[in-house]
Regions:
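Active-site microenvironment for binding and transforming phosphate-containing groups
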Residues: 1-122
Length: 122
């Protein structure tokens, strides 16, 4: 699936480079747009192998309005990491849009910056 992108590639590359199994890795999900704020279209659902024609909530996607869903980005990252065999996954609870006192957010303020996440050996 196209939506797996960097997480899938990162786990595979780290395991190839170190000879470890995915179960020997740990992941920390940094701050990001939260599931109550991240509105996406059908293209994003398709990229993660979901059916945009469905009218019910699908794992990590909740219908919001016609053609729009709320996406759980940390949930999607956890899903991809778990599917690859990574079992120790932490973080992902801080929403950059909702917490203006601690985080910048392009969607909220049109200000760019960087956040961090990590996948490493245990």
């Amino acid at each position: 699936m196209a939506g797996q992108g960097i997480v899938h590639t990162g786990v595979r590359a780290l395991c190839d480079a170190t000879g470890c199994a995915p179960g020997e890795l740990q992941a920390w999900l940094g701050p990001c747009i939260g599931p109550s704020q991240f509105e996406v279209g059908a293209d994003v659902l398709r990229g993660f192998g979901r059916d945009p024609e469905a009218t019910w909530a699908q794992e990590c996607f909740v219908p919001r309005s016609p053609g729009k869903w709320l996406a759980d980005l940390p949930g999607l990252a956890r899903e991809i990491l778990s599917a690859q065999g990574v079992t120790l996954i932490q973080g992902g609870g801080d929403c950059t849009v909702s917490d203006a006192s601690r985080f910048f957010s392009f969607r909220r303020d049109a200000i760019t910056g960087r956040q961090a996440a990590s996948i490493c050996l245990r």
